[in-house]
Amino acid sequence: MCCFRGLTQRTTELRADKPTHAVLAVALLVLAGCAGTPARYPQELAAQEQALAPRWYAPPLPHDGKTTELTQWWQRWADPVLADLIAGAQELGPSIAAARAQVEAARAAVAGVEVAGRPQVSAVANAVREPSIELPLGTTLSAGLQASWTVDLWGGNAASVRAARADEASAGAGWHAARVLVAAETAQAYYGYRLCLRQLAVVTDDRASRERTARSNDITEQAGFTAPAVAALARASAADGRNRQAQQQAVCEQQLKGLVALTGMSEPQLRQQLSEAPPLPGHGALQSMLSVRALPADVIRQRPDVYRAQQDLMAAAEGVHVSQAALWPSLSLSGNVMRNRFSGGGTDITLNSWSVGPFTLSLPLLGREGLRAQASAAEARYEAAARAYAATLRQAVAEVEQSLVAQSSLAARVEATATAVDGYDRSLRATEARYRVGLANLNELEEARRLKLAADSASVALLQERIQAWIALYVALGGGFDPRQALSQE
């Protein structure tokens, strides 16, 4: 390491020889020429966004529904119970707490990097008791301020600050993503449980139908009008109905336990709150919960994972700048202002002193291979971040398009399912009318009833699929994340 030093103490004149001035001037010119390393970050972002498709390759949403702010999307469900459960889950969610801790750690890192790049001032105090040439023993006391500063010649410190701020923004986006996922998970569990109860009602009606058929066949078997094998089959069908009901009831109870774990509420309190929930939304209410009219590049900017990948790319780009800055000389200076007192041998002297220097210009000579290796590693991290950003963009577009395809398919199934439910309902009413006048037996009536119940079960399952698909689209669209307010909303 080579150093150039100049020192002044208790004088206003700074002395340095002409060769030192020349070396300093040449070094500063070299540094100025190398300080303007062009940043590739903006060009990389523009190139990756231009590579996106100019339009969505997926069916549009039905009825071209009105665009709604995603931040207020849960209010469209008009379900205060759901809103309370989401709030409770977000308050207790460990993933949100972990993401929040990452935000605080990133903020602390920003503060540390910013302070490290500024002039440092410390209060110092010294006490020395020792013999001197003139006196056998003396005490020297001093107190004052000591300052030091490493000059940011080509922006390495500034790049470190920008990288730390990018990490902070990335952590903030991660916090928003965690909140969106917890809200979606809670909503899916909530509607999953309520639709499970509706499915349980269908299964319970099916069990009752099978048991009525079994009892009818037992009576006719005893009267000699039904073969024993037919009666045995009816009893087996009734047992199967009881088995399905018990299985469905267990599924519902398990889902309720999951909701208890998510929200932190006691089970009796949660059951009471669920009993006050409004009716489930119908297929008609789900026709236009969201619409996607904007271009892909505009939509995916609202996703926290895309914003996080952008900030990671920026941090990697600034890391390249920092690693390159370490290869060049650094300039530092220091100084102090002191109040001194000497006493000993009957002498008591008080005086003030100050110093400026040394000015140190240092250039690493040995071990530069390690610095070059660190610069190469920073370049590799930047390339990896660029690839990750491109992959995040592609995955974001794919998730939105997959959600749109799912919505289109489910919407097409609504009409067919409604037709099936209506047809089986008409058949059941006709069979009941025939049964009342003796033109149909009980077995025919119960078979028509079971077909109707199966259609009802399919309708409930379709409703659950549609609700889950809407929630998936909400997550795919970013869940109301706004990069301009990524940190202020916390």
Regions found by a protein language model. Give the residues of each.
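N-terminal secretory signal peptides that target proteins for export/translocation
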Residues: 1-17
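Amphipathic alpha-helical coiled-coil segments
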Residues: 96-99, 164, 171, 189, ...
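Long, contiguous alpha-helical "rod/stalk" segments
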Residues: 95-110, 114, 417-421
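Small/polar-residue-enriched beta-strand and adjacent coil segments characteristic
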Residues: 80-81, 85-88, 100, 107, ...
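Hydrophobic, well-ordered secondary-structure elements that form the walls
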Residues: 333, 361, 378, 385, ...
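Alpha-helical heptad-repeat coiled-coil segments that mediate oligomerization/polymerization in large
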Residues: 224-227, 396, 403, 438-441
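Periplasmic alpha-helical coiled-coil/stalk elements that build and connect Gram-negative outer-membrane
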Residues: 157, 173-295, 406, 410, ...
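Terminal intrinsically disordered/low-complexity segments used for targeting and assembly
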Residues: 2-4, 21-91, 165, 249-301, ...
